[in-house]
């Protein structure tokens, strides 16, 4: 049971990171497919959103310090550096706020697909 749970966590993390690495290249019409992928993790959506938060925490940390030692996603340094150079502090803040807002909306039973679409749009814009 333990290795199955660990592999689920790894799959969830890999899926979230893959999406975040290519979010700026995704066209709007591809969002539906991305949301369908996220839907696979609907039961663990808070964990999925936490992974996204950690990703943007790493981007913010690198942008502020240019130090890779404090990063959680150490194996993704190249992509973190790339996104840190493209993102502004206010953009990262907007994304982190959107992640929190998504959690609140999901707790309030707002339509899952709509919440994810708004979140992905905010991430893409920033």
Language-model regions: role of each:
Residues 1-6, 10:
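Single conserved hydrophobic/aromatic residue that forms the stacking wall/gate
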Residues 1, 72, 118:
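Short, well-ordered beta-to-alpha junction loops that form the rim of enzyme active sites
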Residues 87-126:
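Charge-biased C-terminal accessory regions appended to nucleic-acid-, cytoskeletal NTPase
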Residues 11-100:
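Long, well-ordered amphipathic alpha-helical subdomains in the mid-to-C-terminal portions
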Residues 5, 37, 66, 110-113, ...:
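General "foldedness" signal
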């Amino acid at each position: 049971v333990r290795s199955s749970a660990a592999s689920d966590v790894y799959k969830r993390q890999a899926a979230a990171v893959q999406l975040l690495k290519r979010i700026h290249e995704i066209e709007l019409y591809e969002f539906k497919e991305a949301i369908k992928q996220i839907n696979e993790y609907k039961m663990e959506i808070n964990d999925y959103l936490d992974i996204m938060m950690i990703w943007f925490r790493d981007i913010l940390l690198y942008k502020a310090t240019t130090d890779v030692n404090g990063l959680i996603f150490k194996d993704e340094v190249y992509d973190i550096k790339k996104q840190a150079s493209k993102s502004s502090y206010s953009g990262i803040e907007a994304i982190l706020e959107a992640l929190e807002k998504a959690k609140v909306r999901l707790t309030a039973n707002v339509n899952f697909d709509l919440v994810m679409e708004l979140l992905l749009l905010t991430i893409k814009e920033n």
